[in-house]
């Protein structure tokens, strides 16, 4: 059984907070590639930033997500990803037209259920690592919500509830699914 679970969706929708909750409960988590890249680039004066060179940023995110995916395969329990390979490949393909999405998705499959955080304007904020506005975040969300089913994933939209309840929702969903197999 594939235990690499992808949590994607709208920027500012509560993904990172949710992953922190899952980590606090003892689950393996993988931090969003984009945030790690932005931090590295800002510290080192690099240009692979989404507001400087989005294609270079997406390519770096793809490389990092592939490495993250390979590392997670060693885990025995659930591993939760804050975004991942598909998000980065979808961004690169949207920007450049380069047909990378299907090939990368086929080679690196996550759990068949993808959990998406919907737009949640009440909690959306910008910060030094997240500079785009909520309209861009919603456009990105709509694109991802359309992409995942075309790649054979079942999309589960997370409810707008407290972070502990969201974590319970995901864990209960996965537990029920595991019992049914």
Label each region the model flagged.
Residues 14:
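Conserved glycine(s) of the Walker
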Residues 10, 22:
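P-loop (Walker A) phosphate-binding loop of NTP-binding proteins
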């Amino acid at each position: 059984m594939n235990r690499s679970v992808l949590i994607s969706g709208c920027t500012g929708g509560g993904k990172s907070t949710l992953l922190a909750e899952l980590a606090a409960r003892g689950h393996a988590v993988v931090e969003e590639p984009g945030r790690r890249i932005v931090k590295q680039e800002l510290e080192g004066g690099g240009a692979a930033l989404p507001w400087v060179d989005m294609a270079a940023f997406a390519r770096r995110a793809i490389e990092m997500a592939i490495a993250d995916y390979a590392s997670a395969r060693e885990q025995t329990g659930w591993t939760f990803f804050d975004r991942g390979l598909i998000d980065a490949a979808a961004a690169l393909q949207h920007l450049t037209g380069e047909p990378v999405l299907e090939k990368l998705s086929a080679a690196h499959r996550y759990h068949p259920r993808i959990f998406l955080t919907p737009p949640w304007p009440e909690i959306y904020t910008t910060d030094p690592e997240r500079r785009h506005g909520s309209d861009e975040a919603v456009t990105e969300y709509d694109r991802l919500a359309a992409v995942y089913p075309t790649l054979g994933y079942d999309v589960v939209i997370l409810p707008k509830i407290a972070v502990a309840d969201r974590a319970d929702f995901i864990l209960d969903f996965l537990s029920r699914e595991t019992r049914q197999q």
